[in-house]
Amino acid sequence: QVHVPLEPKRIISLVPSQTELLYDLGLDSEVIGITKFCVHPASWFRVKQRIGGTKQLNLELIRSLNPDLIIGNKEENTKEDIEALEKEFPVWMSDIETLEDAFAMIHSIGVMTEKEDEAELLVEESIEAFAFLQNLGQGKTFLYFIWDEPAFVAGKNTFIDSMLTKIGFQNACEQSRYPSLSDFKPATVDHIFLSSEPFPFRSEHVNKYQSIFPNAQIHLIDGEMCSW
């Protein structure tokens, strides 16, 4: 149970995607701190206090800002940092594996920040957008690579899998979370997605993966679109 002030005025965001959400909710003056990876919106990145990286938070700097609400994420932030902050400040953590989890997170943050109407509008617009794209994948299979050497993919029970299956693709990886390509042998794959993050796949990687999957279409993809 997190005891949040009725209307928090000093919010710190520990996750880039949730920083964008706070901006979309119109919380410009309320957000006082973001991470060095919170590059969107650019206007905030230029002027907001940066409190370290998602997994290397500057706890002393955070303490000096005296936040009345800290918003983090179970996967992005470390257990040690969060436990330390929870002893001193209200900390709310998201835990997102599916698109539905993301919608629930938007609603919860909207309620906490007195922006419930704005949050509900964002959810409604997102649902409409996904409904429009629901047949984009046409049942084709995919592997979404997040790392190279060793090669890791996004499997089941990940937000990436939820996003792509929602628009009609099928994951060729049946394993959960982020298995190594060496841990399973995929059947025929229609599409290979090489993400821009966390590993920065570039054009020079395309030929390598085309040789591994000669019948697949290889795509360089903006990781922010599938994992933020």
Describe each region flagged by the PLM.
Residues 1-228:
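N-terminal ligand-binding lobe of clamshell/alpha-beta domains
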